[in-house]
Structure formats: C-alpha cells, structure tokens
Amino acid sequence: MKDKTDTLDAALAGHILARMGEAGQPPEHGIRHVNVGNEHFLDILRVEYLDRLLTQSRGSAFKLVQGYYGGGKTHFLYCVRDLAWEKGFLTALVSLSPQECPYEDPYLVYRAVAGQVAAAPEGAGLEPTRGLPDVLRDLAEETLAPLAPAERDRWLRRSAMRFPVDSHSYRRAAAEFLRCVVEEDREGEVVLEAWLRGDAVPRSELRRFGIFETIERANAFQALRSLCQVLVGYGFPGLVLMFDEADRNLSISSRRIQALGDNLRQVIDLCGASQLPGVLFLYAVPPEFLRLVVPEYPALDQRLRSPVPMSRHSPQAALIDLEQMALGAESLLEGIGTRLLAVFKAAYDWEPTVAIQQGNLQALARASARFSLEIGHRRQFVKTWVAFLHQQRLRGESWLSDEAAEALLSQGFVSSSLDEQGFSDV
C-alpha cells in the first residue's frame, strides 16, 4: 500500500500519536504506518474486487465486516479507504448511530453519503475533496471548463443527460449543477448544491432546471443508487461505500429491525444484479449483529450466512471476520508496537536503544495478552505503549519487567515505586 502520500514526516507522526495515544483510536491520516495483521483481507479486496471493478465497472459487491468494539473495524475501513483512493475510487465512510444516522432511515443515510463522498487527497498532509458538490466542482473545473463551449454543451446534452440512471431528476440535477459551475451561474449552483445534498428546496426554484421533485425519505434509496450511477457515468472508476455501526444498540424494536434488514437486503440484491455499478459496499458491525439482529430477518439471514468467512480460499464469502487475523494476539500487539515505535521516532527525532525497547515491547505485549481476554485490550495496549515511550524519552531508557508491565496496564503511571520495582536503569 504505497502511493504519493506514503511519507512519514514529524507532523503526520505527531497526528498519529495524538490520535492513538489519547483514545487508542485509528488516525484519520497515515493509517498504513500503523497497520498490522489484516493485509490478507486487503489483498483479497484489491485483487478480487477493486481491480476487477476497474476493468468491469458494471460489477458490484457487498461485504459484512465483523469485529468486536475495539477490535479494529474502523481501522480496517480506513485501510480500505486508502486502498480505494490509490486505485482512483471515490469513497464515503459513514458512522451510523441510532439517533443521528440510523441505517434504517434511507434519507439520513443519503445525506450522510452525499456529505462524505471524497476523492483522494492530492498529497501528504492535504485534506481530500469531500462532499458530492465539491467532487462535482472539481470535475467541472478540471474536465469541462477547458473545453470549447460548443463541445461542453454537446457533452452535457448527449452524455450527462443520457446515461442510465434510476432517477431522471437526479441525472438532470447533477448535469445542470455542472453547467452552473462552468457558466458561473452562482444562484443556480447554490440551489442545486442544496438539492444534491438532500436539503429542502422550494419547487419553484427548481422549475427552471426541469426538476419537479426533491429528495425525501420515500425516494432516498433511489437517490443513493442514482448518486453511484451518476459518478460512474462521469468517468470515476467507482465508489467504495463504508458504513460503521459505531454505536448500535442491538436491543431495537422489531419494526426497526425490519427496516434495517430490508434496506440491507436491497443493497445485497442490487449488488448481485449489478444495479450499483462500480460499487464496493462494506457494512461494519459487532458479532452480536449476526447473532441477534440478522436471524430476526430471514431473507437477510439467508444472504449473509456463510459456512466460512472470507479468506484466500473463499474470496467470494460475504463475511470479513476481523478475528481471523494472520497473527496471534501477542504477535499482533508486538507488530503494532513496532510500528508505533517507528512513528514515535519520526515524531520526536529520537533514537532509542533498539534492544531495550524491543524487550520492553515484548514484555508489554505478553502482559497485555495475559491481562485481558477481550479484544478491547488492544486500545489499552496502544495507549499504554505510547505513554511508556514518552516516559522513556523524557526520563531515560530502562528495562521493563513483566510485573511492571502488568502494573502499567492495570494501574497506569501512578506510583514512583514502579521505577524501583520494575525498571532497571541503563
């Protein structure tokens, strides 16, 4: 996973440490520098799905990503996002929540996707172009603006207004938005930007564009399909849509389970029928989702149940189980710690004694693997290791005993006696 953004300078390293050291959460930028253990899943997605979508843009696929809280779901989605950007795909990563954006409400989901659609950043440290209107603005300014007016008008009339899209209103709104951008019709641009985002727009303001409907809950799922179809029609390789059930209360009503199941079933069926062209759809959930929610909706259960999760031997399986890592628990923590040590060195221009810090890392990884049987111990390990490295840099290097490692994980840096009991000064 290397591209033009694959550089680790002090600023990026500091961002990574701040994110992971404060909350044990994956960094928004630079995820590749701390990624360990899921490379086999990423290789499958790259070869079996993204590369194939590049050559067969009418295809599409659905994957259910399963992992415990703190088990790397969001981290994995960040890795998939960066991989997709390398291939030129647009991405949208949406955090779902029962209050703000439940997946069973297609209108809120559409608005979230339209707001999160993003193109790859131009370089390290730069933000991606985010939001459907801005992605279309870039397209208009880079592709349409250089054309002669007659050629541009011909493309809008004969191409942008004609390729297959579920909603004719959506196709027209996107094409007219492009026209407004290149012709500097600011009033029309503002109106159509609001429409594309799913905002309420008076019908009287849409009439001059030949649009007679707005995006509402009843047609929001059609609008989401149309968004995908329009962007692929404009020449983008495809989209990777990722939904992260970050705060799902699994004790939801039967009515909401029915709505959630129906929406997911529709997506799976549309992917199977290639009606979401060039789309890889990932939905990340805790394991309880398959045990408690899916069985309540038999049609969804039949589509998601698989005798084996996705692997090199079964690349078409619908389930990506993040507990099926390529490394054991202790080796995984050591791998993460080694990556974080390299990031720490880059952030502070620090050259520690390799043997000492490798020994300290092994002690902390052993203690963490013993300390908790829950997957969430990874976050605690990450935060403790970053804090420990700060101590080593500021107070001088020392060896960490197994007893002191367990104390760090359970108590933190609370007693100066740890220096005497568990650290050996160098």
Show which residues each predicted segment covers.
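C-terminal alpha-helical "lid" subdomain
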Residues: 179-194, 312-316, 324-426
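P-loop NTPase motor core
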Residues: 82-169
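The catalytic "switch" region of P-loop NTPases
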Residues: 4-15, 195-358
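Short, surface-exposed basic-aromatic patches at helix termini and helix-loop junctions that form
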Residues: 79-88, 262, 273
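Helical mechanochemical/support elements of P-loop NTPase systems and associated helical scaffolds
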Residues: 12, 37, 41, 61, ...
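A short, basic N-terminal segment
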Residues: 1-61, 398-426
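Conserved P-loop NTPase mechanochemical-coupling segment
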Residues: 150-221, 249-251
